[in-house]
Amino acid sequence: MGGPYIGIVADDLTGSGDTAVQFVRAGWATQLSVGGAEQALADPAVRQAEVLAVTTHSRPLAAADAAAVVRGEVERLRAAGVQRLYKKVDSTLRGAFKAEIDAARLAWGEDAIAVVCPAFPVTGRTVRQGVLYVGDRPVTETSAATDPVTPVTESHIPTLLGCAQLAAQAGETPAELARRIAAAAPVVVVDALDDADVQRLARAIGVLGQRAVPVGSGGLAAPLARVWAGGQAAGPVLVVVTSQHSAARQQAAALQQAGARTWAPTLAQLADDRNWAAWTAEVEAAEHGMPAVDALMLLAPEGRLAGLDADSVARRLGELAARLVLAHGAAGVVATGGDGASAVLAALQASGIALVDEVTGGVPLGTLTGGQAAGLPVVTKAGGFGEQDVLIRAAQAIRERRFTK
């Protein structure tokens, strides 16, 4: 690697840690430095990291001093080739809040947009009409107001920053939110009342690309780490469903309804070599010219046909899946049904799976070892396991995690 892709600049060590760990959970190789970027980047081990979190220790500093420190750190990270910046701030607005945000934005680039949302709903921090709440109270009515070093005197973040504020809008897409943010630049506070709002904002930041400087706590960092990981994924997640279990069929239907492009051969096509060759040629030719999708599904038909057993169905679909992966690329593979999972691995000549996590109980996530697609993310699932949305979640787990091959 040539150096970190993502830089995190935090005003204290604990905040740096609780933000950096969100990137670890999303699969990024992450290094936390107790000091600044210059010292960290001199370490060969740090140069191998994908995410570097640096600590400015600037929370108790005067505004001008804090701004100077932050500006220097961002400039050094930028010079080192960092492509994405996350400015970690205190979730109760302590410190030289405005000075550090302005310094980070200006150092990042002329067209940079600071997107500010310190919400962390799981810890009770939310932003409503621009006001930061801790539980049901504005932050100035909490102990943060009497902090002995950096007391908080303003709950309304747009007043504190002198900037625009955007309320959440029901049904708004991330792209629509991104357009509103861009129109309100260069500094924008965005409301977030719950995790869904924070996740939508993270996706909007992904749409904005490199010019966005997200400003927040661990609450925004968690979904953003997944969004940025998804930006590294190439191709669709290929889902292979061979199980006849009713749960698997319902899960496949849910995935198709969510937008997965689906190829489903008939029993007659699977049973006859000539029919099968013609159908697979049609699929492979069509996939060359079709628009990109997040998920592509190969779905075995329901029912039985004399002379056609489950192993043959699994083998044919597994071999087709392997050809699609090798010809077109894929972000990963999800296989439901033990025979189907075995067939996919056999067709790719994989020797095993290096496990890294699980999508949900009994649904492991890993990467293939050996064979023609070593390092390819893979989820395997028994046909009867999981809730109705488990295939959707499995595809998301692959797309929203960083895998280092």
Swiss-Prot record:
Its EC number is 2.7.1.219. It comes from the Bacteria. It is an enzyme of class 2 (transferase). InterPro entries: 4-carb_acid_sugar_kinase_N (IPR010737), 4-carb_acid_sugar_kinase_N_sf (IPR037051), NBD_C (IPR031475), NBD_C_sf (IPR042213). It catalyses: D-threonate + ATP = 4-O-phospho-D-threonate + ADP + H(+). Keywords: ATP-binding, Carbohydrate metabolism, Kinase, Nucleotide-binding, Transferase. ATP binds at residues 243, 337-340, 383. Substrate binds at residues 12, 59, 88-91. It holds the Pfam family NBD_C. Transmembrane segments: none annotated. One of its GO terms (molecular function) is ATP binding. Belongs to the four-carbon acid sugar kinase family. Catalyzes the ATP-dependent phosphorylation of D-threonate to D-threonate 4-phosphate. Can also phosphorylate 4-hydroxy-L-threonine, with lower efficiency. This is D-threonate kinase.
